[in-house]
C-alpha cells in the first residue's frame, strides 16, 4: 500500500506520475518533525537492513554511513564521499517488517543511516516542503514494484544499445573514429557503438560539429552504419556565450537561460568557457532545448549521452574574483593568507554551493533559486531530450543516458555512474550499485569499464569486462591523458574477443530480462536478500547478484586471484564460458564453493530447474543468428523469452 503525506508547499518534481490521495497527519512509522526544517527519525533493530538510494557509495545495505542527496561533479569516488552525481531518495527498511519511503524533495537531503548513532536513522532537509510516500508490502521486492508503479515505466533503449561500446575522451577526428572501428573489425572484437566526447564539437558548442575534423559528418554517420556502428555524441549542459552562435542568440532572445536575481543571465565557465545554462525547469525552454537534438538526429544520429548536467561549474565571476583577491594578498606577503588558503580557494572554485544560490529558474512564472531545486537539473535536461525524441522520432527508439539524475528521469533515459577510476575497488562498487539503481527505476545502467581516471591494467580491464557482460550499458571509457585501454592495445587480443563475445552470446537472455523488468516494473538486478529473504548468509552477501529469475553472477574483483569463493543459496549449475569458446558446466550443491575463473573466462550460475537461451558468437547485434540459439541449463527446463524488433517504440 502506498500512502502520500504532504509537508508545507512541495515543489512539483513530477517524479511520481500516479495520482495518490493525500493522507492526514504523519506516517505511522518513526517520528516526524517540522520544527527546524524537516526530519524523520526511526530506530533500527539489529537485524534491520536499509536498501536503496540508487547511485550512492558503499554497499547494498546502506547502514552505517551518511549519504547526502546533492548532485555533485566530483570524480574522486573514495569511500568517504557522501554525494555522487545523482539524487535517488528512495529507501527500504528491511527486517521483521518491510517499509519503504520516498522523500520527494529536490534540494539537499541528508540520510544519516546509523552514522551518528548506530541504531538510529534520521532523514533531514532544510525546508519542510516535500512529499513523503510510505509504502508497505509483503517483501522488499513487493515494495520496489509498488514504488516503480507510481513513478512510471523505465526507459526502453534500442536493442543495439545492448552491444558493446568503445569511448575515450581524446578521439578528435573522423580518422580517429575510423581507426578505432577498423582495429575492432580487423581483430574481430564485437562492437556496436563508438562514443563521441566533447572534441567532435566546434569549440565545445552544443549541437555543432567541427567541420575541419568532420568535413562530411552525415556521410561519416552513414559509413559507420554500414559497418553496423552507431555513433553516440555527447551533449553538455552549458551553452557557450558567443555572438553569432545560433543556440546562444536564440536562447537569449527567447529568455530561455537561467538568470540572476537582477534579471541578467547567469554566467559560469565550463568546457566552452563562459556559458549560460538552459532553464530546463521552464517548460518552454525545455521544449526549445530538446528540439535542438534534431540537429544531429537529422544527420542520422540515434544515440546520445548527456554530461556535465549537475550542472557542473568550473568557476563563476564571483568565485574567480574571490580567488584573485586571496592570491593577490598571498603574493603581497599578507601573513593572514598562508599558501594553503590560496590552494583551498582554488579548489573551492568548482561546483561551489554559493554559485548555486546565484541563479534562478522560471517555473510557471515564479522565480525559484537553483539551490532549492538543484537535484532536478540533470533530470530535466534529459527529460527535454526524451520528450523531444517522442516528437522527432515517434516510432523509433533513440538511446539516451545521462550523468546526473533524479527519480523520474528514468522514464527518459538511463545513466552511467560517472567518472570512476581504474581501481579494483570500483569493480565492486559498480556491482553493488546496480540493484540500488534498479530499485529507483534506472535499468539501463553501467560504469566506465576499465575505469575512467588513472591507468588501467590488462587484468583489471578483463575482470571488469566480465562484469560488464551483464550490465545493460557495456562501455569502455577512459580519460584524456590516461593509458589507452581499447582491447587491441594489449597482448592476447583473443582473450578480449572471447570475454566481450560472451555478451553477444547472452544478449537473447539479457535483452529479454531487461524488457521484462521494464514492462513489469521489476528489477533486472536483484540483491540475494530480495530472492532469499530467509537465508541469513544470502541476505548478507553483497558481491553476488541475481539477474532475472534464472541466473546469479559472482564476478572476480581482486587482482591476481585465480577465482573466488561463492555462496550458493540453493543447488545451481556453474557455467563458465571458456577462453576457447566452449562452455564448462557443473552442478554444485547449496553451500560455499571456491570456483576457479581464468582472466579470459566469464562465470555465471543457473538456478535449479532453469535454463537460459545462448547464441553463437557475433561481432554486432544484427549479426546474432536466431537459429544459433540453444538452451543452456537444467535438462527439460523451459524459458519464456521476450523478443521484438529492437527498434520500435513500445
Where in the sequence are the language-model features?
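Glycine-rich, histidine-containing beta strand-loop boundary motifs that form or position
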Residues: 42-44, 94, 102-105, 113, ...
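Extracellular structured ligand-interaction cores
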Residues: 85-89, 96-98, 106, 129, ...
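Catalytic core of carbohydrate-active enzymes
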Residues: 63, 78, 376, 382-398, ...
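Aromatic- and carboxylate-enriched substrate-binding clefts and catalytic-loop regions
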Residues: 190-496, 531-532
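Short acidic-glycine loop/turn motifs at beta-strand connectors
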Residues: 92-97, 260-262, 569-570, 579
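A residue-level signal for conserved active-site and pocket-lining positions in enzyme catalytic cores
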Residues: 90, 147, 184, 224, ...
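Short, hydrophobic/amphipathic alpha-helical packing segments
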Residues: 65-71, 84-87, 178, 286, ...
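Catalytic and substrate-binding clefts that recognize carbohydrates or anionic sugar/phosphate headgroups
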Residues: 1-158, 168-170, 174, 181-186, ...
Amino acid at each position: 500500500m502506498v500512502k502520500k503525506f504532504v509537508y508545507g508547499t512541495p515543489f512539483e518534481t513530477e517524479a511520481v506520475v500516479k495520482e495518490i490521495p493525500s493522507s492526514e497527519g504523519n506516517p505511522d512509522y518513526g517520528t516526524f518533525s517540522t520544527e527546524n526544517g524537516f526530519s524523520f527519525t526511526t530506530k533500527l533493530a539489529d537485524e534491520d537492513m536499509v536498501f536503496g538510494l540508487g547511485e550512492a557509495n558503499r554497499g547494498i545495505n546502506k547502514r552505517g554511513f551518511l549519504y547526502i542527496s546533492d548532485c555533485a561533479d566530483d570524480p574522486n569516488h573514495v569511500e568517504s564521499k557522501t554525494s555522487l552525481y545523482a539524487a535517488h531518495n528512495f529507501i527500504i527498511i528491511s527486517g521483521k517488517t518491510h517499509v519503504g519511503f520516498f522523500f520527494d524533495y529536490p534540494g539537499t537531503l541528508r540520510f544519516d543511516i546509523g552514522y551518528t548513532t548506530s541504531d538510529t536513522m534520521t532523514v533531514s532537509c532544510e525546508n519542510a516542503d516535500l512529499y513523503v510516500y510510505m509504502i508497505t508490502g509483503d517483501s522488499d521486492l513487493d515494495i520496489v514494484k509498488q514504488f516503480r508503479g507510481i513513478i512510471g515505466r523505465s526507459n526502453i533503449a534500442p536493442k543495439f544499445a545492448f552491444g558493446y561500446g568503445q569511448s575515450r575522451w581524446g578521439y578528435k577526428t573522423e580518422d580517429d573514429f575510423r581507426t578505432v572501428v577498423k582495429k575492432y573489425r580487423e581483430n574481430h572484437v564485437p562492437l556496436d557503438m563508438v562514443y563521441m566526447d566533447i572534441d567532435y564539437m566546434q569549440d565545445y558548442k552544443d549541437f555543432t560539429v567541427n567541420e575541419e575534423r568532420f568535413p562530411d559528418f552525415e556521410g561519416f554517420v552513414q559509413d559507420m552504419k554500414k559497418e553496423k556502428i552507431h555513433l553516440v555524441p555527447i551533449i553538455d549542459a552549458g551553452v557557450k556565450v558567443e555572438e553569432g552562435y545560433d543556440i546562444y542568440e536564440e536562447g537569449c532572445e527567447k529568455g530561455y537561460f537561467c538568470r540572476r536575481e537582477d534579471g541578467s543571465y547567469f554566467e559560469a565557465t565550463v568546457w566552452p568557457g563562459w556559458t549560460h545554462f538552459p532553464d530546463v525547469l521552464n517548460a518552454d525552454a525545455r521544449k526549445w532545448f530538446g528540439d535542438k537534438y534534431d540537429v544531429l538526429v537529422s544527420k542520422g544520429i540515434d544515440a546520445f549521452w548527456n554530461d556535465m548536467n549537475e550542472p557542473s561549474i568550473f568557476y563563476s565571476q564571483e568565485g574567480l574574483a574571490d580567488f584573485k583577491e586571496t592570491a593577490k594578498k598571498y603574493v603581497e606577503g599578507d601573513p593572514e593568507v598562508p599558501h594553503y588558503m590560496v590552494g583551498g580557494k582554488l579548489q573551492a572554485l568548482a561546483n561551489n554551493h554559493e554559485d548555486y544560490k546565484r541563479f534562478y529558474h522560471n517555473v510557471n512564472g515564479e522565480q525559484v533559486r537553483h539551490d532549492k531545486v538543484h537535484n532536478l537539473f540533470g533530470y530535466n535536461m534529459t527529460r527535454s531530450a526524451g520528450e523531444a525524441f517522442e516528437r522527432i522520432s515517434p516510432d523509433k527508439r533513440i538511446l539516451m543516458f545521462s550523468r546526473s539524475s533524479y527519480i523520474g528521469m528514468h522514464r527518459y533515459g538511463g545513466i552511467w555512474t560517472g567518472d570512476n577510476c581504474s581501481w579494483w575497488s570500483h569493480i565492486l562498487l559498480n556491482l553493488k550499485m546496480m540493484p540500488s539503481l534498479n530499485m529507483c527505476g534506472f535499468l539501463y545502467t553501467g560504469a566506465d569499464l576499465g575505469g575512467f581516471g588513472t591507468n588501467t591494467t590488462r587484468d583489471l580491464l578483463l575482470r571488469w569486462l566480465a562484469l560488464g557482460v551483464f550490465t545493460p550499458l557495456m562501455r569502455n571509457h577512459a580519460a584524456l591523458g590516461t593509458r589507452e585501454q581499447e582491447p587491441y592495445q594489449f597482448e592476447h587480443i583473443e582473450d578480449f574477443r572471447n570475454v566481450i563475445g560472451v555478451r553477444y552470446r547472452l544478449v537473447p537472455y539479457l535483452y529479454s530480462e531487461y524488457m521484462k523488468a521494464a514492462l513489469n516494473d521489476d528489477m533486472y538486478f536483484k540483491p540475494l536478500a530480495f530472492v532469499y529473504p530467509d537465508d541469513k548468509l544470502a541476505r548478507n552477501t553483497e558481491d553476488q547478484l541475481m539477474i532475472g529469475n534464472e541466473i546469479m553472477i559472482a564476478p572476480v574483483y581482486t587482482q591476481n586471484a585465480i577465482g573466488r569463493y561463492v555462496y550458493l543459496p540453493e543447488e545451481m549449475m556453474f557455467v563458465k564460458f571458456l577462453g576457447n569458446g566452449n562452455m564448462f558446466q557443473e552442478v554444485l550443491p547449496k553451500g560455499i564453493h571456491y570456483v576457479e575463473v581464468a582472466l579470459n573466462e566469464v562465470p555465471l550460475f543457473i538456478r535449479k530447474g532453469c535454463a537460459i537461451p545462448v547464441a553463437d558468437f557475433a561481432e554486432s547485434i544484427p549479426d546474432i543468428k536466431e537459429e544459433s540459439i540453444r538452451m543452456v541449463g537444467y535438462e527439460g527446463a523451459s524459458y519464456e523469452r521476450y523478443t521484438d524488433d529492437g527498434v520500435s517504440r513500445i
